[in-house]
Amino acid sequence: MTNRTYIAIDLKSFYASVECIERGLNPLTTHLVVADESRTTKTICLAVSPALKMHGIGGRPRLFEVVRAVRDANAKRKYRAPQHRLTGETTDATELAASPHLGIAYHIAPPRMALYVAYSVRVYEVYLRHIAPADIHIYSIDEVFIDATSYLDTLHISAHDFALRLIREVLQETGVTATAGIGTNLYLAKIAMDIVAKRMKPDADGVRVAQLDELSYRHALWAHRPLTDFWRIGRGYAAKLEANGLYTMGDIARCSLGKASEHYNEDLLYRLFGVQAELLIDHAWGIETTRMEDIKHYRPKSRSIHHGQVLQMPYATDKARLVVWEMTDALAHDLAVKHLTCDRIELTIGYDVESLTRPEIRSLYHGRIRTDRYGRSVPWPSHGHCTVERGAPPRTLMNALTHLYDTIVNPHLLIRRITISAQHLRAIEQHSADAKQLDLFSADEAAGTVLTEEERRAQEKEKALHAAVVAIKQAYGKNAILRGANFIDGATMRQRNGQIGGHKA
């Protein structure tokens, strides 16, 4: 088997860099954070510029954490300043370093998701000048994997120089710089980029390129901590590993070699993580068998569409019911646009922390409690599903979901998150071609709920009306035609129709 060479490229603080470029500012020296401050200071920042991160700010903080970190940093600067006094402030790191009497200031840029998508398309077009689409996997809006194997010999170039060529061309055309990782498999390329490159000193353009193979990975990173720095190891995985005395990738690799009679062996890992232990063990050794062609040929066994939103404030039960109704309407629209049907819809309701901090609500709740990622106690989410007829009109879906909502929701609690998903997707053409199989044991059949001719005509009329609505929205935008309920206080559809990924377009 031919040895492969993969390159992973991550655009540096992408959203923040784009906002700096659009303002004519240097992305590497400007203090800027991308956040919608209209959502209060609790809103999550989508990006923080590299210069602002230097003051102890993480990549995805909440806005109040940025405010606090800058305030603390300015207090230290004031203490060290001449006469313990700051005479002004600046948003530029270079000027700040040369002027001890200045304080730290920063720009707050509201998200512009459509602009970021446009920049991402421009970057991808640069890659396509050098690489075939079959050799590129778009991992996210700002990150790609490239199988560079066949290009290196043809161009008589090293992987490092090829990565630099791509990054510098992107920089020249868009102003956005990047970090790259090179590896003998996809996992090592990702780890080289995420861990090794980001610890390197950047060049004058902010570019970092790191390279790993299986042996150098074991030498450099078997003792690395924390485990959460590694791809696919989240807080839950790391906590479970550390609770069992496994703190590093080297620990996991050694554990996988243990004898059956020893406490630490691969059986321990399989008991902890099930079949996922196989991937964890491979990654501990720097092994990844998935190749680019495997990604391109992958087809999921079951397809689904998910809609989710975090409400800007805690909602009472009645108010959140309207949002569930709207989200189901939006889901029906997506199914129609994509010519799909489903036979099952799932609903998950996440509750707000105030449900447990307000005594008048807490006294009414006696259910399970979980701890969120910030260490706060939150009521256990409610979850349920309902079956629906394939091709059912929007009103049928909306009635089914609101009934499900009324069934599973705790009416005493405040709601913060809502997620719905359409399961078992199938193309309309496939559904229409399949004969409907009668089920003697179906509740609907037994209850005699087969539609009458008049009901069927009404349903077909509603479907035709919905098709017209879909056509109008596709031509003139999702807010071109709305339901009256979308204007009720607490409704979110009008606002969300102007968003991409839950943020301002």
Task: Tell what function each PLM region has.
Residues 80, 343, 360-363, 433-437, ...:
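Composition- and surface-driven signal marking solvent-exposed, interaction-prone regions
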Residues 12-14, 38-42, 351-356, 425-428:
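Short, charged/polar surface micro-motifs in flexible loops or helix N-caps
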Residues 8, 229, 237-415:
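DNA-contacting surface of Y-family translesion DNA polymerases
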Residues 18, 373-505:
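Acidic, metal-coordinating catalytic segment for phosphate/diphosphate chemistry
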